[in-house]
C-alpha cells in the first residue's frame, strides 16, 4: 500500500510527459494522479488499526547494501494524508495562473509529492535526511522559475541556502550516530543506549537543522521572502506541508532517539519559541503586504506547536499534531484568498483594499471563516490544537506558556484587524469593483473549509489513531 502511494505520483509524471504539448491534458493527468494518491491515502487511513501499538503497512525493498523499510504509525499517517490532500489543491489553484513551462511545473509538484510522502514513511534516519534534502530541489525550481515577482531568484537561493546549511549539522549528527550505534534504522536507534553527553551534542545538530525549517527566530528570514515571491501553489505547499517537516523531525528523531537531551534542552526550546511567537505576532501587526501578514502568522503558529511537542505530555503532543494539521489547512486557504484578490487587482498592499463585502460577498464569507479558524475560535481545528497544546505546555512551564499564550491574543488582534480593513467600510477609491470568486477558486477552498471544521468538531477521528504512537514518546 505504501509503495503504491510512492509510485502513483511518479506514474503521473510519466503520464504528463506522454501527454506531449497538450497542456490541458497534462493538467488533467497530474490532477487525476494526485487525486488517486489521495484516495490511496484514505484507504490507508481506513485500514489503520488504532489499537495496534507499532508501525503498520510495513514494507521492505532491497537497496545496494541492505533492506530498507517503510511504514506508518499514528503520527506519520496524518502527515501523509495532509500531503496527498494539499497537492491536488496546489494543482487546481494554479490551473490558470501558470502560463510557462506547465509540463515541468506539474512534474515538479508530482516529484515533490513522492519525496514528501517518503519523508514521512521511511524508517531509516539516513533515508529521512536524503529525502529531507531532496525536497529542496523541486522547491527551489518552483520558487525560482514560477515565482510571482522580480526577486524570486533571490528568494529561491535564500530558501535553498538557509535550509541546506542548517541541514549540514544534521548530517554530521547522523554520521556520529552511525559510528556510535552501527545503524541508522529508526527502531534500532529508538532502543539504543546513547550517553547523555553524546545525546546533547547530537541534539544540537538536529536542532540547528529543524529550527531553520520551523522557522524559529532568528532563522526565519527566508520564510516571508519565499512566500512573497512564490507562486500561489508554492505558498500553499510551503505553508501546508514543508513547515511541518521540522515538527515531524523533532518528534520522530530528536525526542524519540535523544530523549535525555530533549528534556535538558526543553527550557531553551520554550524560550526561543516564546520569543518567536511574540516577535512574529507584533511583526505581523506592522505588515502592509497581505502575503507577509499570513507568512509571519505562520511563524507564530508553528512555534506554538513546539511548546506542545516538548511538553512531555500526551495532551500537549497530540495538540501540537492537531495544530500542525490545522495550520496545514487554514494557512493555504488564507493564501488562496489573498491571491484571489491579487489576480483581480494586481496588488497585495493592504491600503488599497476596503469594502470588499459589497462586490465580493462569497470571498468575504470564505475569508471570514478562515480568519476565524486562524485565530482559533471554537469548532475550528486550530482551537482544538491550541487548547490542547497550551494545556500540555502549562504542565511543563507555566510562566513561559502564559507568555506564549499572548500569541493567541495578538493573533486575534491582527486577524480581526485584517478582516475589518479589507471587507468592511466604504468601497476603496483606488480599485474598481471586480467579480466574486469563480467556480474553480470556490472548489479549492471548500475542501479546506470542510477539513478545518471536521477536525474541530470531530477531533477524535484524528486523536484516537495517534494516541498510542504519542504515548510511546513520553520520557
Segment roles from a protein language model:
Residues 1, 11, 15-107, 471:
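Transmembrane helix-loop-helix hairpins at membrane boundaries of multipass inner-membrane proteins
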Residues 1-8, 72-83, 126-138, 199-210, ...:
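Structural signature of hydrophobic alpha-helical transmembrane segments
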Residues 13-17, 88-92, 114-118, 141-145, ...:
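Alpha-helical transmembrane segments of multipass membrane proteins
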Residues 14-23, 87-99, 141-151, 214-228, ...:
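C-terminal ends of transmembrane helices
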Residues 21-24, 54, 107-198, 283-348:
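Alpha-helical multi-pass transmembrane bundles of energy-transducing inner-membrane proteins
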Residues 49-67, 152-154, 168-228, 250-268, ...:
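Juxtamembrane/interfacial segments at transmembrane-helix boundaries in multi-pass membrane proteins
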Residues 224-226, 230-234, 242-328:
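Acidic, glycine-rich loop-and-beta core segments that form the ion-binding/anion-interacting portion
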Residues 331-334, 395, 402-433:
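Predominantly late transmembrane helices and immediately cytosolic-facing juxtamembrane segments
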Amino acid at each position: 500500500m505504501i509503495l503504491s502511494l510512492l509510485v502513483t505520483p511518479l506514474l503521473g509524471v510519466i503520464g504528463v510527459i506522454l501527454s506531449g504539448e497538450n497542456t490541458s491534458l497534462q493538467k488533467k493527468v497530474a490532477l487525476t494522479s494526485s487525486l488517486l494518491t489521495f484516495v490511496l491515502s484514505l484507504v490507508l487511513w481506513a485500514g489503520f488499526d488504532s489499537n495496534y501499538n507499532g508501525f503498520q503497512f510495513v514494507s521492505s525493498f532491497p537497496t545496494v547494501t541492505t533492506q530498507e523499510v517503510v511504514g506508518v504509525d499514528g503520527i506519520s499517517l496524518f502527515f501523509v494524508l495532509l500531503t496527498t490532500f494539499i497537492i491536488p489543491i496546489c494543482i487546481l489553484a494554479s490551473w490558470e495562473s501558470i502560463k510557462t513551462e506547465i509540463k515541468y511545473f506539474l512534474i515538479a509538484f508530482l516529484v515533490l509529492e513522492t519525496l514528501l510522502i517518503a519523508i514521512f514513511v521511511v524508517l531509516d534516519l539516513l533515508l529521512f535526511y536524503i529525502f529531507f534534502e531532496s525536497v529542496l530541489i523541486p522547491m527551489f525550481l518552483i520558487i525560482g522559475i514560477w515565482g510571482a515577482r522580480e526577486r524570486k531568484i533571490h528568494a529561491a537561493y535564500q530558501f535553498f541556502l538557509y535550509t541546506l546549511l542548517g541541514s549540514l549539522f544534521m548530517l554530521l549528527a547522523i554520521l556520529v550516530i552511525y559510528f556510535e550505534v552501527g545503524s541508522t534504522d529508526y527502531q534500532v536507534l529508538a532502543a539504543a543506549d546513547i550517553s547523555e553527553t553524546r545525546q546533547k551534542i547530537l541534539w544540537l545538530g538536529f536542532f540547528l537543522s529543524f529550527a531553520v525549517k520551523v522557522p524559529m527566530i532568528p532563522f526565519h528570514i527566508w520564510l516571508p521572502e519565499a512566500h512573497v515571491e512564490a507562486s500561489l501553489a508554492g505558498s500553499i505547499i510551503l505553508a501546508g506541508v514543508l513547515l511541518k517537516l521540522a515538527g515531524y523531525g523533532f518528534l520522530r528523531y530528536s525526542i524519540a532517539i535523544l530523549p535525555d537531551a530533549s528534556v535538558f534542552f526543553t527550557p531553551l526550546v520554550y524560550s526561543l519559541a516564546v520569543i518567536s511567537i511574540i516577535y512574529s505576532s507584533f511583526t505581523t501587526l506592522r505588515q502592509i503586504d497581505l502575503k507577509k501578514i499570513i507568512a509571519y502568522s505562520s511563524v507564530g503558529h508553528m512555534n506554538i506547536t513546539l511548546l506542545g511537542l516538548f511538553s512531555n505530555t500526551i495532551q500537549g503532543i497530540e495538540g501540537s499534531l492537531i495544530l500542525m494539521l490545522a495550520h496545514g489547512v487554514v494557512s493555504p486557504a488564507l493564501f488562496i484568498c489573498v491571491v484571489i484578490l491579487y489576480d483581480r487587482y494586481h496588488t497585495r498592499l493592504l491600503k488599497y483594499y476596503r469594502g470588499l463585502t459589497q462586490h465580493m460577498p462569497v470571498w468575504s464569507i470564505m475569508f471570514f471563516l478562515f480568519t476565524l479558524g486562524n485565530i482559533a475560535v471554537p469548532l475550528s481545528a486550530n482551537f482544538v490544537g491550541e487548547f490542547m497544546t497550551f494545556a500540555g505546555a502549562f504542565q511543563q512551564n507555566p510562566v513561559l506558556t502564559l507568555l506564549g499564550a499572548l500569541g493567541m491574543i495578538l493573533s486575534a488582534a491582527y486577524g480581526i484587524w485584517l478582516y475589518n480593513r479589507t471587507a468592511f467600510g466604504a468601497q476603496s477609491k483606488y480599485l474598481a469593483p471586480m467579480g466574486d470568486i469563480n467556480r474553480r477558486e470556490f472548489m479549492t477552498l471548500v475542501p479546506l473549509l470542510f477539513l478545518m471544521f471536521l477536525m474541530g468538531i470531530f477531533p477524535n477521528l484524528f486523536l484516537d489513531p495517534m494516541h498510542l504512537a504519542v504515548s510511546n514518546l513520553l520520557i
